[in-house]
Amino acid sequence: LVAAALPVSYAEFLPYCDTYTETIVENWAHCDGFCASLKKRIKGHEAEFFEHIKRYLASENPWAVRVGLILMLNYYLTPAYLPAVLERTDAVQSEQYYVRMGQAWLLATAWAKDRDTCRAYLSHHHLDAWVFRKFIQKACESYRVSAEDKAYLRSLRKK
């Protein structure tokens, strides 16, 4: 978390971010805490940082993949980015529990923010059954999802 507070430029910060992501993050608390600390650091650099996140999603390190997912969850569930976020999330294939939970959590949060875009995405998704069911569970546990939407999502689980 100290890396997020370093008094360096955005360009100088990226190598610290990469090193932390690839070598220090080793559990969900490191991942989620680090991602939450980056708000001020990426402000004004959202588009370029969104591109930078691709490297984490493509990593062999499951914790780096989770960092990429949680960064998108925290900062990119907006109308401008959501279609690309869903596409990137859909492309992640992992058997690692915390990566899969990150996918489900991101999708449930995205549903709460923009149901219509997510509903369109669900018509052609490539999620594995476990992630899909977990997404539905997480969305149905959310107070931000309407009763009608919860019923709709539960109906998808049965298909």
For each feature predicted by the language model, list its residue ranges.
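Alpha-helical scaffold domains
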Residues: L1-K159
